[in-house]
Design a protein with these regions (language model features):
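Boundary-proximal intrinsically disordered activation/regulatory segments immediately upstream
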Residues: 1-71, 157-158
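Short acidic-hydrophobic, aromatic-tinged amphipathic segments that line or gate anion-handling sites
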Residues: 4-10, 81-86, 176-186, 243
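Active-site/ligand-binding-proximal alpha/beta "capping" segment
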Residues: 198-251
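A glycine-rich helix N-cap at a beta->alpha junction
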Residues: 75-95
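RNA substrate-binding interface of SAM-dependent RNA methyltransferases
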Residues: 5, 107-205
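Short, aromatic/basic amphipathic alpha-helical patches
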Residues: 67-79, 235
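Structured adenosyl-cofactor binding patch, chiefly the S-adenosyl-L-methionine
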Residues: 102-104, 142-146, 157-172, 233-272
């Protein structure tokens, strides 16, 4: 049986990890062994458990303890604390209405190397400085649905384990293998692994998405840039190809998550 602890005051320190710790504080780079992330909703929590993530505590509405949370709690150590409170207290937590009544603090798993993530992968996505957690989450969902085998990210971008990113991804950040790229010339590391690199950018010499050189590549990395400015000139210069999405009505760009969906469908799913 879960160790249920009822909270009566929003200022209770037991709620600090859920209500007052920032995402950066949870990451705890000074002490990685104690770094945490928060998973929201039964679906996301379940997928995190499927991926082997270790729960530390739960926060949920009282009815979920014996309701839709019972199956999840049954998969966990019965001595884990399960905090609960009235809806009046819980709704003081910013965004609680988006959590479907259930949150879980979990330990951050150690990240694999780029080579480990890419082992056996034919199509991967690379995110250079994508800053918005919503975009990162949406891209992971597209990657899972549209044939991407892995996602690599630069360290300056948003963390896939941020609450909003994992929620928007519908838990797909726990299904698609991912890790961070090394500092410096990471395109060289991808070339060493046998990947053809395709930079999504509007240039005069850009290839169309359906170019045979892209479709026939044995291993292809689709490289997407930050919101607004897109990829850096240095990254574009270091990639094998520059690729564009043909558009009409004078539109010259898409949101990065929308561009990812189009590119993944053509270069991922269609090439399987």
């Amino acid at each position: 049986m879960a160790q249920v602890i009822e909270i009566h005051d929003f200022s209770d320190p037991a709620l600090d990890v859920y209500a007052r710790a920032t995402e950066n504080q949870l990451v705890n780079r000074a002490d990685p062994a104690n770094a945490l992330f928060i998973a929201e909703s039964p679906l996301v929590i379940g997928r995190a458990l499927d991926a082997g993530c270790v729960p530390v505590s739960f926060l949920m509405e009282p009815q979920h303890i014996t309701g839709k949370g019972a199956e999840i709690l049954g998969r966990c150590d019965p001595d884990l604390p399960v905090y609960t409170a009235s809806l009046e207290v819980l709704t003081q937590l910013t965004g609680f209405h988006l959590t479907r009544g259930m949150l879980c603090a979990m330990r951050r798993p150690p990240l694999p190397s780029v080579a480990e993530v890419c082992a056996g992968a034919r199509r991967i996505a690379v995110l250079e400085n994508v800053m918005n957690p919503t975009n990162v989450g949406a891209i992971f969902r597209c990657a899972a649905a549209l044939g991407m085998d892995a996602v690599l990210l630069t360290t300056e971008g948003s963390d896939p384990l941020y609450r909003r990113a994992s929620r928007v991804s519908m838990g797909n950040v726990f299904l698609v293998p991912w890790t961070y790229l090394p500092e410096g010339d990471w395109t060289a590391a991808l070339h060493d692994l046998g990947f053809t690199t395709a930079a999504m950018a509007l240039r005069e010499d850009s290839l169309r998405l359906d170019d045979p050189r892209l479709l026939s590549a044995e291993r292809l990395a689709v490289v997407l840039g930050t919101e607004g400015d897109g990829l850096t000139d240095g990254t574009i210069a270091q990639c094998d190809h520059t690729v564009m999405i043909p558009m009409t009505h004078g539109v010259d760009s898409l949101y990065v998550a929308a561009a990812a969906a189009v590119a993944f469908y053509q270069l991922g799913l269609q090439c399987q």
